[in-house]
């Protein structure tokens, strides 16, 4: 494999091309991209954890340093002002020298408010991309050039097409997340609490809670029915029945987002359902290819859900087609089949149909689907089907003409297990699909 430095060099070439195109389209001279700033907790002097501007880390793998600035014009070497204060209260990151610094001009910025004296005097035609509009106004950036929608839409649209450098980073993030999942399963099997399982995961991935790309979902038993459960009980339940782990990792700013579900016992109805969801997930991925709408795969999986509901006698005396048509699969899988993945976990532009930002909403029947794009090579997406037993979604079906088709006794027996989700991260290629997760032998 090419070195990361060589891949990064080509990555910058691609970003420079996109920059030239977007500047010409919107008649701008350059983009000033701000890493962001620290924001204090209300009525306190402690800041919230820093989260870098994703458009900034698209260019440079600097994810922990606020008050940095990047000036790009698509022609000259990108110029990075790296915040380097004299500060004995806090850790100060040294001026970077790494695989990427040959491609970027790196200059120390000793004072956060010193950027004004470093920029070109004429700034009326510079676009600001960042989270602090008032800072841009102070720098005499025109209000119309602060996060201009057309520029943002263009940049977001092309972020769907990962460079080889980005794919290499995402494969590294996968390795870290897979290590975490293996450690977490072992912790679950040894009877640990959600809190302690989370610690085992973080230790294995080398992350702290503020480093992971999203809050880990560490859900034992019925907690697996809460789609974004992040509470972390300190006490292990008296009986371990099930474990759903939705947790990722980050490498050079790029995310992994994996989910696995385990049954404490290997021979009960729940364990068999977990195996079948896993098998159907793999079967769907095997059918994926460029040129097909992501929506189609979501709809196809509802047909697979119907097959499982029928096989496991959760829904009875109804055809699979009728289940999907009447949305009886909906309460069992209330979320989308997945989402774009990259610099952000729910990566941008999932609904954009072109680089002008044309929006295609999710089908009204499936409003929580996060992507309606036609799959193309270099796109990275999650495939994360699930089956859950969520009372608030099942309750409306307890009355009415379809109630008789629900095997309520079976559902009540499965509710203490919460639910099931299996999630892999896949890359679309010209001639097939790369499953980054399964390539690392994560069962």
Curated annotation (Swiss-Prot):
One of its GO terms (biological process) is proteolysis. Its EC number is 3.4.13.9. InterPro entries: Creatin/AminoP/Spt16_N, Creatinase/aminopeptidase-like, PepQ_N, Pept_M24, Peptidase_M24B_aminopep-P_CS, X-Pro_dipept-like, X_Pro_dipept. GO terms for cellular component: cytosol. GO terms for molecular function: aminopeptidase activity; metal ion binding; metalloexopeptidase activity; phosphoric triester hydrolase activity; proline dipeptidase activity. It catalyses: Xaa-L-Pro dipeptide + H2O = an L-alpha-amino acid + L-proline. Transmembrane segments: none annotated. The keyword Hydrolase applies. Binds 2 manganese ions per subunit. It comes from the Bacteria. Pfam families: PepQ_N, Peptidase_M24. Keywords: Dipeptidase, Hydrolase, Manganese, Metal-binding, Metalloprotease, Protease. Mn(2+) 1 binds at residues 257, 339, 384, 423. Mn(2+) 2 binds at residues 246, 257, 423. Its cofactor is Mn(2+). CDD domains: Prolidase. Belongs to the peptidase M24B family. Bacterial-type prolidase subfamily. Splits dipeptides with a prolyl residue in the C-terminal position. This is Xaa-Pro dipeptidase. It comes from Salmonella typhimurium (strain LT2 / SGSC1412 / ATCC 700720).
């Amino acid at each position: 494999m090419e070195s990361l430095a060589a891949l990064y060099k080509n990555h910058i070439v691609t970003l420079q091309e996109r920059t030239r195109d977007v500047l010409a389209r919107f008649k701008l001279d350059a983009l000033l991209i701000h890493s962001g700033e620290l924001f204090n907790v209300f009525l306190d002097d402690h800041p919230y954890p820093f989260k870098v501007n994703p458009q900034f880390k698209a260019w440079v793998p600097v994810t922990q340093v606020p008050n940095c600035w990047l000036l790009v014009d698509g022609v000259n070497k990108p110029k990075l002002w790296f915040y380097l204060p004299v500060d004995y209260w806090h850790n100060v990151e040294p001026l970077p020298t790494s695989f990427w610094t040959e491609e970027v001009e790196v200059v120390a910025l000793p004072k956060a408010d010193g950027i004004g004296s470093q920029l070109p005097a004429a700034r009326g035609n510079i676009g600001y991309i960042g989270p602090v509009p008032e800072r841009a106004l102070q720098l005499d950036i025109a209000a119309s050039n602060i996060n201009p929608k057309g520029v943002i839409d263009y940049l977001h649209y092309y972020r769907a097409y990962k460079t080889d450098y980005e794919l290499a980073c995402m494969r590294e993030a996968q390795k870290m997340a897979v290590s975490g999942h293996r450690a977490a399963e072992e912790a679950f099997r040894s009877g640990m609490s959600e809190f302690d399982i989370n610690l085992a995961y973080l230790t294995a991935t080398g992350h702290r809670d503020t480093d992971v790309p999203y809050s880990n979902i560490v859900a034992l038993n019925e907690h697996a029915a809460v789609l974004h459960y992040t509470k972390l009980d300190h006490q292990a339940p008296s009986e371990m029945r099930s474990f759903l782990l939705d947790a990722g990792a980050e490498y050079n700013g790029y995310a992994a987002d994996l989910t696995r579900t385990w049954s404490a016992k290997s021979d009960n109805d729940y364990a068999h359902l977990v195996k079948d969801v896993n098998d159907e997930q793999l079967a769907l991925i095997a059918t994926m290819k460029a040129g097909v709408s992501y929506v189609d795969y979501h709809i196809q999986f509802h047909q697979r859900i119907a097959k499982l509901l029928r096989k496991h006698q959760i829904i009875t005396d109804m055809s699979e087609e009728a289940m999907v048509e009447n949305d009886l699969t909906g309460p069992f899988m209330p979320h989308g089949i997945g989402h774009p993945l990259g610099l952000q976990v729910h990566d941008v532009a999932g609904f954009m149909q072109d680089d002008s930002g044309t929006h295609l909403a999710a089908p009204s029947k499936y409003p929580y689907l996060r992507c309606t794009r036609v799959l193309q090579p270099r796109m990275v997406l999650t495939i994360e089907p699930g089956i859950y037993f969520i009372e608030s979604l099942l309750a409306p079906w307890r009355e009415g003409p379809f109630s008789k088709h629900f095997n309520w006794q079976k559902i009540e027996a499965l509710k203490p297990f919460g639910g099931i989700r299996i999630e892999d991260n896949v890359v679309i290629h010209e001639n097939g699909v790369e499953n980054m997760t399964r390539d690392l032998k994560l069962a």
